[in-house]
Amino acid sequence: MWARKALSTWLSLILLGLASSRAAYGQSVLEYHGSPGRSGSFVVPYLTWERARGIHREVAFQPQFSGHLYAQPLFWQPAEMLIVATEDDTVYAIDVSSGNEIWKRVLGRPVPLSTQPCGNIDPLGITGTPVIAEGTQAIYLDAMVEEASGPHHKIFALSLRDGSPLPGWPVDVADALAARGQLFDSVVQNQRGALTVLAGRVYVPYGGHAGDCGDYHGWVVGVGLRNPQDIVSWSTRGQGGGIWAPGGIAADGRSLFFATGNTIGVSTWSDGEAVFRLAPDLRRETRSQDFFAPSDWPTLDAQDADLGGTNPLPLDVPFSRGTAALVLALGKDAHAYLLDRDHLGGIGGSLASKIVSTGSIHTAPATFTVGEDVFVAFQGRGADCPVPSPDNALTVLQISIGTSPSLATVWCGAFQGAGSPIVTTTDGHSNPIVWILGAEGDDRLHGYRGDTGEPLFAGGGPRDTMPGLRHFQDLLATRDRLYIGADDRLYAFSF
């Protein structure tokens, strides 16, 4: 089961693929963590271990915008621009080199916290990381918009050229689902997970607000990239079960993977505390190969110990007879679960499980390889750190097969904050560096050798601090810079 800036310039860049007169900034970063699989792995040829020691913040790079920023910025290489979507319901295109604004698009009025039934984002606008579809040359995102009738979740498709909405967009989620006989209450639903694209549709995950108020459910809504009337959906049977992890939905080219949080007031399993695999049509399946939930899901529900705190991470792990197609799930219950990607296992059917942290895990993991070995980095205090320290807040696991799948902690890193890690290598394997932000902690960038955990960059000097980082925030890697989004501005680090 395992194996297996002007318009002419714009058109020239897109259609003819002409080289820019400025330095190339590497491949586009179209979605969260750089790939549908949410690997968080970036190839940066010149970022060796030695050069990482001299990385520094470019104080002259000071693009500014309006709004709190929870979503990861994106990078569109043909026009050499960064895309930033903020809680002010505004999307900006920013020149990757100068930091100058190329265009901006205001999508509506965000929703103030004072009018929300619960929550912790004020105001609430665009939270989940958008996705870029190369085929339509558009950015897709969900925005919470305040109107006379109340708050509305709207899915937008914006032209990369100037930010204008494509014909037929936006889609009002509640209205679109009501036309299909389904109830979606925008007041109690929140959208913070990253979007993805698969098989001609954009997929948007929904959960509830912080505080679990109201009759919300976990939802996935798919909308045709070229036909916004083409809508498919899936929702949890029980109340709750939100899909709220910052990584949102992962995809492996065939299927969608996501994790749900705690359900509320259920006596039988009703889709909470689970990892799901769905086909692009989002058809509900009840086969054990299409979902996994820990056997103690009632306890997790009662303790609000969501399995849905991180996105599932597809992994391909070499072993003696080929390659194992796995999924790693990490939970607020501090467990890691290894699953067979082709047969998730139903209730209690993991291949391996282990307590890997001394506290909750609820950011996005990243994966990388060293030789034939597969590693996963996550923000959390490791339960089995080789060198114990009260400051350890980054943990790296090795995933092995052997006679059976297993997980082991190989190193831990000390820093203060709650960012999500990424990994850079120079060629896909060499010079692995795990980068993480001290978001809502020391507000600094930290880098570690991926193979040993040796600190390479420990935050720098006074000019390298980054006020305004929001929890769960991660980095964006291009050819010669690392970019970080924060409230009202972007930061860039050069090497």
Regions found by a protein language model. Name each.
Residues 351-353, 390-425:
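A beta-strand-loop signature enriched in Asp, Gly, Thr, and Trp
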Residues 352-356, 381-386, 408-414, 462-466:
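Short, contiguous acidic/charged loop-to-helix segments that flank catalytic cores in large enzymes
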